[in-house]
Amino acid sequence: MSLAASAGRGPGTMWSPTHVQVTVLQARGLRAKGPGGTSDAYAVIQVGKEKYATSVSERSLGAPVWREEATFELPPLLSSGTAPAAAAATLQLTVLHRALLGLDKFLGRAEVDLRELHRDQSRRKKQWYTLKSKPGKKDKERGEIEVDIQFMRNNMTASMFDLSMKDKSRNPFGKLKDKIKGKNKDNTSDTASAIVPSTTPSVDSDDESFSKDKKKKSKIKTLFSKPSLQKTPLSQSMSVLPTSKPDKVLLRPGDFQSRWGDEGDNEDESSSASEVMSQKRTSSTDHTQPNQSNFSLPKKEGLSFLGGLRSKNDSLSRSNVCINGNHVYMEQPEAKSEIRESSPSNSPSPQGFRKRHLFSSTENLAARSPKEPGEGGGMSSDRRLSDSSTKDSMKSMSLPSYRPLTTADSREGLSPANMEVATKETKDSKKQESKKSSLLSLVTGKKDVAKGSEGEPLPPVSEKEKGRKGVLVEAQLREEDLVRRPEKDAVPVASQWGSSQNPFEDAQISDLEASVESKCEPKPPVPVPRTPQTRAVKPRPHPVKPMNTTAPKITNSSLGTATIISENLINEALMKKYQPSDPAFAYAQLTHDELIQLVLKQKETISKKEFQVRELEDYIDNLLVRVMEETPNILRVPAQTGKKAGKM
């Protein structure tokens, strides 16, 4: 924003520059003073009493280039046009030729009135100025010089000028400070008011007897009503505001003993007055003694309560001290320590012994059970018998009831005890089958079954008797089946007594029994046609023992472990291995949850940084707008900064 835009505002709205920056760029058409039509030219810049000189442009052919700048402080340009102000606001440019011997030779000079240049409503003026001769000499062609002049306002120097004004009016707070300082220098009432905080003392209860003497009261009043101890309102405000409420002062007759004694000698007081004074002194001393004890004993008491700092042999700790009717005993921390020592964690109480014994007994049982199987032999054998009986009962339920074990293979595969049991079973089965055949022959009435009684004729049997006999036969067959089942159940139990207790051998025996059953299939003992009414044994749904369920479980578990191992191997192969020098090595060892937490933290920090960057950008934008409005000349400075001219 230039002053040309604000030309219509009038001189009242013009701003006053504090500095001027002069940049000497170049010159042309200079007279040659050196050999070969050259010159070693330099320029001198002067405003008021300050001078600056540029560097020497050696052997220039009448067109030296300097591009050097100098800054001068200006007086107020808008003041009235007096002679000193006009001389201080004139810019003088002098071009000289440097001579090796003697004085430098004059090439030309130019003068610029800065007030007129500022009134031209432009902050920056760049133009060519013609060089002239010295005043009083004939003008010649001396060439031109190009100068860039820029007016500036430094706010710091302007504020310094404002602060240095002597006729500036003081604010009321400054006047108040001056008054307070003057009072402190002249009077000593502030110190007196700080020493004596209040003029209305609180009288102690022992001073009631002193109220009879009116003369003494008047003397005390006159003592405190002296003008040297009175407060002025200013000193009172200074002493009361920064401090808290002062404590009350207890006045005793003993404090004014010497003053009253002197006055008593001067006035020749009676003997009654001296007796009163002696009574007052004794009462004051008696009054101060309990106060001293009250102030001293609580300190010791407080020290004694802090963790038992005193030893047990201390006389004060042993004695029962009575302070204001309260007995203080020093052995309370010891009682607390005794209570702590009698806690169940440290004391060997019977409950603690019982708990420890229980824990140790359970640990011993848990430790001995796998190591010493022989100690609990009775219990383990009973459990094994029950388990084996349940297994064999399941086997017998799954096998058919009419199984004969009479083959040689079965005898070879079994132990001698099992062989005897098997032979007994075959004999019993033969007897039962013969009984069945005889009963069936009786029921059906066929003659070919009864071979022994061929010649004896059978008596005729009615249909009712046949039905009754069939029912009886069915009942007998059911009873025989019930008796036969527990016998077969007991056979493997007896065989297991002699066999080993290894579960794998049990599985082998069961497999052998299954193979024996498959080899020796049961044959019908007698081809006798049966009616549905006389069928004794129902066919079982599972004539063959079911397959062992442990085998597929083992295979499934082995397959699962194999798949897990293969998956782990694949994952290890797919995982990329990082070297310790790689920065990714620090993150390769982290778990999934740790990586998620790390990402969230990084995201939070990035958001905070983005917020800070946004705030800085907004601040810079606002600052740039402010600079453009107030001092746009900063933005007009060219990128190439000129050299500084040397001060002369």
UniProtKB/Swiss-Prot annotation:
The keyword Protein transport is assigned to this record: yes
Region (Necessary for interaction with RAB4A and RAB11A, subcellular location and endosomal recycling): 584-648
Phylogenetic classification of the source organism: Eukaryota, Metazoa, Chordata, Craniata, Vertebrata
Domain C2: 1-129
Protein name as catalogued: Rab11 family-interacting protein 1
UniProt gene name: Rab11fip1
Quaternary structure (record): Homooligomer. Interacts with RAB11A, RAB11B, RAB25, RAB4A and RAB14.
Molecular functions per Gene Ontology: small GTPase binding
Superkingdom per UniProt: Eukaryota
